[in-house]
Amino acid sequence: MKLWLLRHGEAQPYQQHDAERQLTDRGRQQVRDTAEHMRGIAFDRVLCSPYIRARQTAELVCATLELANTIEIVPWLTPEDDVRAVTRKLDGYSVETLLIVGHQPLLGALAGWLTDADRLHSVPMDTASVACLE
């Protein structure tokens, strides 16, 4: 499986409810720019965090790339979710190309865990950055 990890674009400063933060104008442009680099990739599934900024990111990517994929919102892709629990959930997806839209520190921890680069440290991922793992 090719696993694509995409961190959401730049979001509004921290608010009372982290899950409700939205993308800034700059964040939206970051996402569109990143999506252009992914043009031509046929994603079998798109999984996304329930947080607003991640959902906005997934929607922008699908719109920019003119993907017909339905975005599947899953509750286990929040910033503090356990990487081992996430990998167990991912084992249930038998697809060739999967896009996950989420957050740090989860995505960086997932990249480190799956590559065995360093299971104790997170891989840095800036806003709207993407990593592809095979």
Label every PLM stretch briefly.
Residues 2-84, 107-108, 121, 125-128:
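Active-site-proximal alpha-helix that buttresses catalytic centers in soluble enzyme cores
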Residues 85-134:
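Active-site-adjacent alpha-helix immediately C-terminal to a catalytic or transition-state-stabilizing loop
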